[in-house]
Amino acid sequence: MIVIDTDCLSLLDRERYIESSKLRIHLEKFEPDEVFATIISFEEQMRGWLSYIVKCKTVDDQVFGYGRLHAFLESYRNTQVLDYDQAAANIFRKLKAEKIRVGTMDLKIAAIVLANNAILITRNLSDFKQVPQLSVEDWTV
């Protein structure tokens, strides 16, 4: 099972970047039912687009923002999303108690990945490698 971190999900929306191409090449090796996002990534991306829209100063910027929000929602229609369930919450509490210096949202993503015995695909190796027993890979290098 592969879980794509928020940073890589965002990168997949930017097809013109070489990192996006590298990520897609790796993803093609897996069946669609082996690739997941997390509800935490959904929340992070949703908050990002809503924040963008709130800050828009022009109608044209709003049109762009709502268009991107719509595209984001459409992309998740075909995405399997792992929940932040009780097993993940228990792991999250344990990791918090260990005082691992990783942001709360990243720690929740790590907990979901650990609860599902998955591999996390991210560019943020410096943070996620601090999480004990978490399998992480960067497919953009």
Feature locations, PLM:
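Alpha-helix capping/helix-boundary segments
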Residues: 8, 41, 88, 109, ...
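Active-site neighborhoods of divalent-metal-dependent phosphate/nucleic-acid chemistry enzymes
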Residues: 47-53, 75-121
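Residues at the C-termini of beta-strands that transition into short coil/loop
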Residues: 39-40, 85, 124, 140
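Short secondary-structure boundary/capping segments
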Residues: 25-29, 73, 81, 110, ...
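Acidic, PIN/NYN-like endoribonuclease modules and their adjacent C-terminal/linker elements
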Residues: 1, 110, 114-141
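Short, flexible helix/strand-to-coil boundary loops that buttress conserved ligand/catalytic motifs
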Residues: 13-16, 49, 96, 132, ...
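Short, well-structured N-terminal submotif of metal-dependent ribonuclease cores
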Residues: 1-40, 51-70
